[in-house]
């Protein structure tokens, strides 16, 4: 039976179309995905992301554990409480189990935020490894998570919390601070400024209501996906999976190769691929015509066929955009097979849109 977040009643009350997502009943939209998308690009939107998994790790061995488990290096957070780090969690073959964010907290513990779709893989792995290493680990299912995104996100938080939000509003991207009992990270998945607010689950409905009263537009999974695609952000299970490495998913920048003696899980496989070169790479495409290039569509190239990993109509650009996995040696003559016809495409470097501006 699908699970419900603490904000389920708010979604139903607002007329959301609710769908099953990774075992959770989540809002797809509240009437207009387009209006929700545009609200985030031009004003402020609100997302329930309480289905994501929050796991807290603490104790003398927590740092060493995460340095072994993650491809990026939490040593980068040393002495920087409130700082966040984006990383992949890999399998032994170098494949991406999940992408996640880890925060160093004020008390020298760590907070890991991972995806809902991988909850049953990531959390048990962290808890099991923590237990073996004598690290205190806590699955924080007592928490909810609300993302406030858009150019007016900061002003809405200031309006609601005043001076109490000063530290959070002073944060740069990938930093976090407290707003009372709220853990506020200046992070998001939309390509706009914003905050992800982690708070006690029983306080989430009241905060959601206050945010909507302040003018934030409730947004569903549909807008979340079109916004992240415009921002050129990967989605687990699409741009990356356990058979795809960070080097094949445009995430090589998240792998900390130094120091060379840090033996994180998947390192040997990645080093082998790094020496010989990845067979695939992830690119952005602007596709001619009006028909969207959907996930799974074939991409013809001068070096063999690739595949669309995510594709949709871009509300901001007014035409189809896509992310695609193509042979590493492909250089041009991009064509996408749409309904048995080939549509010409132009390779671009994502993001397509960032902070409301077209980048391609």
From Swiss-Prot:
InterPro entries: GCS_T, GCS_T_bac, GCST_C, GCV_T_N, GcvT/YgfZ/DmdA, GcvT/YgfZ_C, TrmE/GcvT_dom1. Signal peptide: none annotated. GO terms for molecular function: aminomethyltransferase activity; transaminase activity. Keywords: Aminotransferase, Transferase. The lineage of its organism: Bacteria, Pseudomonadati, Pseudomonadota, Gammaproteobacteria, Chromatiales. Transmembrane segments: none annotated. Belongs to the GcvT family. The glycine cleavage system is composed of four proteins: P, T, L and H. Coiled coil: none annotated. Its EC number is 2.1.2.10. One of its GO terms (cellular component) is glycine cleavage complex. It is an enzyme of class 2 (transferase). This is Aminomethyltransferase. It comes from the Bacteria. The glycine cleavage system catalyzes the degradation of glycine. GO terms for biological process: glycine decarboxylation via glycine cleavage system. It catalyses: N(6)-[(R)-S(8)-aminomethyldihydrolipoyl]-L-lysyl-[protein] + (6S)-5,6,7,8-tetrahydrofolate = N(6)-[(R)-dihydrolipoyl]-L-lysyl-[protein] + (6R)-5,10-methylene-5,6,7,8-tetrahydrofolate + NH4(+). NCBIfam families: gcvT (TIGR00528), PRK00389.1 (NF001567).
